[in-house]
Amino acid sequence: MLVHGYPDNSEVWHEVAPLLARDYYVIAYDVRGAGRSSSPKGMRNYTFARLTDDFIAVIDALSPGKPVHLIAHDWGSIQSWEFVTEARLRGRIASYTSCSGPCLDHVGHWMRARLLRPTPSSLGKMLGQLVRSWYVLLFHLPIVPELSWRLWLGRAWPRVLRRVEKTAIVPRATQTADGVRGVSLYRANFIRSLFTPRKRVAHAPVQVIVPTLDKYVSPALSEDLSRWVPQYWRREVVARHWLPVTHAARLAEMARELIEHAEGKPESEALQRARQHGDRKPLCGKLAVITGAGSGIGRCAALEFAEQGAAIVAVDIRAEDAERTAKLIRLTGGKAWAHTVDVGNAEQMEALVDWVGKELGGADIVVNNAGIGMAGGIVDTSERDWQRILHVNVWGVIHGARLFAKQMVARGQGGHILNTASAAAFAPSRDLAAYATTKAAVLMLSECMRGELAGQGIGVSAICPGFAETGIMASTVYTGTTEAQQAQLRARATKLYQLRGLKPETVAKAMFSAVQHNKPVVTIGIEAHSSRFISRYAQWLSRLIARVSMAGH
C-alpha cells in the first residue's frame, strides 16, 4: 500500500510501484483532496480520523483478509503514523516503511522534552527543525497559500522542484487543485498534535528511511523513536526530500527487505544493523572495514569502533591476527568477521569488496590502515624494496579507497573513508625516502578523494600520527644494512618509540573523532603537529632537518 504526500498524488509512485509489482500486489490511492479523489469542503473533513477512515475503506475493499505492507512519503507518511498506531488497525498492517514524514504526536513529545530539559544541542536541533518547517506557518495563514497556488505556483511547480530540489517531475493536470486542497491537511492536524500530543505506540514493525539532505524534515526527529516503536529500524540515504522520484530503486529495495523480514525471512545484515534500541551508541548500525586490523593501530581502531557500536570486518594478511581481533570484539559483545587479504592485490581486494556488499550490505566506514615501515636513503633502496612498500602502502590504500568508494556511491547512503598516512607525509627525511614518499602520496590521495566524494555524502580523512608505539618498528626494513645491523636498529627504534609513549589507542580515538566530525587531516602527537606547521610556514627548516641522519648507519 503506497500513500503519497503533499502536494503530490499517487503518480509520485510511478517509479517505485513497478519495482514492487514484480513480487507483490501493489495498491496506490489518491488521498482525499488530491488527484481523482473527492475533495470535501471544510477543515473538519481532513482530520486524521477521516484519513484513517479512508485508509480502512481502501484495505477493506482491496485486501480484506490479508494485512498490508505500508510505504508512505511526506504527508502520506505523517498520516500513516496514525494508521500504524491506531487500535482499530492492529493486525491489518504487516509493516510500515516511512520516509520524510514523522508522527506529529511524537514530534510534540520530542519538542516538549527539549524544552523541559534544554541543552545547547537539543535546543539547536529543535530550532533547526522549526526553521525547516517555515512553510507550516505559511499554510496556516488565511487565503495566502491558496492564492499562491492559483496565481503561479501550480503552473510553476515542476520548475520550482527542478531548481530548489534538483528533482524532475512531469506536470500534472491536478497540480493546482492538489496544492490548494491539501493545505487543509496542515490546518486540521498540526496545532492539535504538536500542542496536545497523544501517546501513540506502533503495533507493527516500522522502518524510517531518512534522506540526509532533506530541507524540510530533520534527521533528529527519527533519532530516538524506540519509546514509541517496539520494532524499529532507521536507515539513512544521501538524498533530497522526494526520494520516491529520485531514488525509487533504493527505496523499493529497503522496503522489500523489511517486507521479507515481516513475512518470515531472517533479517539481512544491513537491516539487522539498522535495528534501533533504547541506548544507541554513535556508530550503532554502521559497518566498519579495517585493513591491517591484526595489530597496532588497526586492532585498536577495530576495538574502538566496535566499542562505539559498529560491526567490524577485521582484515589482515595474517589470518590468525585478523581472527584474534575479531574474537576480542566478539568477547566484548560486538559483531565481527575476520578476512585474510593482501591489500596490494587488486583481485583479492575486489573479492573483499564484493563479499562485503553481498553478504553484509556494504561498508559505512573504511579504514585503509595496512602498511609497512622502511628506512634508508634513495641510494640504498632497491627496486625490490620500492615495489614492496608501494604494493602495501600505496596500492593497498588505492585499492581500498577506490573500490569501497565506488560501492558507497552506488549504495547512496554516504560513508567515511580513513587513510592512514603519517607525520612523515609532512617531513622530508634522508632516512625515510621511500616511507615518507608513500605517506605523502596517501595524504594527497585523501585530499583529492575528499573533494571528489563530498557531493556524495562521503567523508575522507587522512590520519597522520607521530611516533606511535605500534610494533611497526620491529618489522621495519632498513635498506643497505646487514641482518645484524637491522636487528640493532629495530631494537633502538622500538625503544625510542616506547619512550615517546604515543599509544595506538590514542590514534584510534582520533580516528573515531575524524568520522564523527568529518575532519580532513588529523595529526596526532606533537611531532605530527610541528612537522605540519614547519611544512607550511618554514619550508627552509624542513629542508634543513631533512639533511640530518637519525638512523645512525
Roles of regions detected by a PLM:
Residues M1-R36:
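Conserved HGGG/HGGXW glycine-rich cap/lid loop of the alpha/beta-hydrolase fold
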Residues L287, G294-S295:
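Conserved glycine-rich cofactor-binding loop
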Residues A401, T438:
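Active-site helix of classical SDR
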Residues S422:
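Residue(s) in the substrate-gating loop at a strand-loop-helix junction
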